[in-house]
Structures are given as C-alpha cells and as structure tokens.
C-alpha cells in the first residue's frame, strides 16, 4: 500500500514544481510566479483527472461481474491518488494567496504584509473554497478508508465508474484559466464551456442514476426499486456524494447562461435564476 502512496506523494508535487519552474525560467516564457503557480496547479489537476478517468475506464470495462470482479488498478490508483488531494488543498491555497497579492491586497513581498494578513488570507481561502476543501478531506479521511477496508475487494466496477467522474475536470481547469486571463469572449472558452457542461452532467450528475441502474440490471430490479433494495447507508453515501455535484452543476449552468446569453438579453430561465 505504501508504494503507490509514496509515488503519488512524489509525482503530483513534483509535477507542480517542474511546471512552475519551467514557466518561470524558460527564456521564451519568463512568467510571473503568480501566473506560473495558477496554471501549474490547473495542469496537475488535469493530469490527475486524465489518469483517474483512464484508470476508471480500464477498471469498469474489465469487470464483467459488477460485484465480484476485481482489477488491481482500482486499489493501486486509489492509493496513488490519496496524496493528490492533500497536495491540492495546499495548491489551491497558493493560487488563492497569489490572486490576493495580485489584486493588491498584500505587500510586494512577504515582509511588507501586515501582521495577521496570512491568517486573513487563509480564512478567506477556507470561506471561498470550503466545499472543495471539505470534498478533498472527505476523499482522504472517509472515502479512501472505506474503499480499502469496507469494500473487501467487492465492487471494483463501481469504483471504476466513480473514477471516470474526473472526465470533466480538464474542462473545468481550462475554463478557470481562460476566465483568469479575461478570455471569456473567445470561441475556445465557449466550446470549452459547452464540453464542461456536457461532461459534468454525464460523468458526475447522471453517474449516480447510472450506477443504480447498473445494479438493478444485475439484480433483476427496476431502477426505482433499487434504493429500497440496498442498505440505507449506501443510499446516504450516494446522496452525500451527489449533493456537491448538483451544487457545482448549478454554478456551471449559471455561468453558461451568462456566457451564451449576456445580461442585456437573458432568456426567461436565466431571469428566474437571477
């Protein structure tokens, strides 16, 4: 178990540092540290997402029996990804800190900042990214132990499908980069926004009904009968995982309304949301 976790603890921070230093030091680029940190953090998140979704696809398509079939990659990648969530909490804080500095709320260097300003930035970070930090902490403290201990080698198919939820992450990361650099008017941003909306809907929101349907097909049950046929704690866990996805999907839909129908002429649906 330790080998994949150690590997993850080296790969993700190492990739971040490599990307940041490359963007800062290449003569053709010479990016500012803030820009290099933000883009590097998004790059690492995208790489992790591609790796996770690829592993998930391999596992889910290899498990013909959705309960009993096993694939070594399910446990190996789960262990490998644990350090990513810990790293990403810190990487998100670095992005928030640099954005705070760029906006002019801090001094030009660390010594120039007022006492307590770092704590104020940390509180602002936790306030703004509370749900994401909570999600990452739950992945490490709850989901990982459950996947290793409670599953007892069962349900690799379902774990593979859950890993494929990361398909939407590269589009989310690219969208954030384009917004950060005021590229909302570009065709790339609009195409990426449409792909982000579609991938998030299919791979994160509709994923849960699909998993219930897959189990119902395996057990010979109609979809609506599945929640009553499985343990209550499974339904509770699915609801807790689905809830933040629905919230984030709402934010994506609201952003899509503002992108494709500016406020000067919003459609009735957007007016109702505003």
Swiss-Prot record:
Protein name: Ceramide synthase
Organism of derivation: Homo sapiens
Entry GO MF terms: sphingosine N-acyltransferase activity
Example of a GO biological process term: lipid homeostasis
Pfam families: TRAM_LAG1_CLN8
Membrane-spanning intervals of the chain: 130-150, 159-179, 194-214, 223-243
Gene assigned in the entry: TLCD3B
Domain TLC, residue spans: 34-261
Entry superkingdom: Eukaryota
Catalytic activity: sphing-4-enine + octadecanoyl-CoA = N-octadecanoylsphing-4-enine + CoA + H(+); eicosanoyl-CoA + sphing-4-enine = N-eicosanoyl-sphing-4-enine + CoA + H(+); sphing-4-enine + hexadecanoyl-CoA = N-hexadecanoylsphing-4-enine + CoA + H(+)
């Amino acid at each position: 178990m330790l080998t994949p976790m150690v590997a993850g603890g080296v790969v993700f921070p190492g990739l971040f540092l490599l990307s940041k230093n490359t963007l800062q030091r290449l003569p053709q680029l010479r990016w500012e540290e803030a820009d290099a940190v933000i883009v590097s953090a998004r790059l690492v998140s995208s790489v992790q997402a591609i790796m996770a979704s690829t592993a998930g696809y391999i596992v889910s398509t290899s498990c013909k029996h959705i309960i009993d079939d096993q694939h070594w990659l399910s446990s190996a990648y789960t262990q490998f990804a644990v350090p990513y969530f810990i790293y990403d909490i810190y990487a998100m804080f670095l992005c928030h800190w640099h954005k705070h500095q760029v906006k002019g709320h801090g001094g030009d260097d660390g010594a120039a900042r007022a006492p307590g300003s770092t704590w104020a930035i940390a509180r602002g970070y936790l306030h703004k990214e509370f749900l994401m930090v909570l999600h990452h902490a739950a992945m490490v403290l709850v989901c990982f132990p459950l996947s290793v201990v409670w599953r007892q080698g069962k349900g690799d198919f379902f774990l593979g499908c859950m890993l494929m939820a990361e398909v939407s992450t590269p589009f989310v990361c690219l969208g954030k980069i384009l917004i950060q650099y005021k590229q909302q008017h570009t065709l790339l941003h609009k195409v990426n926004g449409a792909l982000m909306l579609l991938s998030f809907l299919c791979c994160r929101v509709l994923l849960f009904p699909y998993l219930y349907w897959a189990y119902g097909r395996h057990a010979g049950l109609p979809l609506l009968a599945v929640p009553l046929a499985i343990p209550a704690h499974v339904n509770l866990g699915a609801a807790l995982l689905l809830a933040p996805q629905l919230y984030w999907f709402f934010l994506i839909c609201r952003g899509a309304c503002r992108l494709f129908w500016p406020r000067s002429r919003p459609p009735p649906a957007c007016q109702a949301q505003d």
